[in-house]
Regions:
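Acidic, proline/glycine-enriched N-terminal capping motif
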Residues: 1-145
Length: 145
């Protein structure tokens, strides 16, 4: 299954905590919480009428972030054509965390079903997240086919 979400990738920011008496509440910062809500809603629309993955899956995620406006046209072209990749923050692992959290329970029943994960960061004029999910056959099923 291939999915394209037209949403700007958002890093998982450090959780915030508030305390009231002996109770402490930990929560996502507003930007991260908004991103997770919006991505989850987009995924729910895509998954309408489809069954969630329950078995072992392989997931490939490509994060496309905006090209900075302060660069030359030549550099802009190099970035959008994939000759130059983003080596700046946010880190790839923070993109992964926020995205997998948002999609957990929507595309797959639990993120424990993800046994292979391939991710990458790219530049693009239209920020988005592209996801490919493949259900993997176990060794017993492979040997029978």
């Amino acid at each position: 299954m291939e999915l394209i979400f037209n949403i700007e990738p958002q890093q998982q920011e450090r959780p915030r905590a508030t305390g009231r008496g002996r109770f402490i509440r930990v929560y996502d910062p507003p930007k991260t919480a908004k991103f997770k809500r919006e991505l989850k809603q987009l995924a729910m629309l895509e998954m309408r009428g489809k069954t969630k993955y329950e078995k072992a899956i392989s997931v490939t995620i490509r994060f496309y972030r905006k090209v900075q406006k302060s660069i030359s046209k030549k550099e802009h072209t190099r970035r959008t054509e994939g000759h130059v990749r983003p080596i700046v923050k946010p880190d790839l692992d923070n993109y992964i965390k926020s995205t997998l959290d948002a999609l957990n329970g929507v595309i797959w029943t639990d993120d424990a079903t993800i046994v292979e994960l391939n991710t990458s960061k790219w530049y693009a004029d239209d920020p988005r997240i592209e996801i490919e999910v493949k259900e993997l056959k176990n060794d017993e099923e492979r040997n029978q086919n």
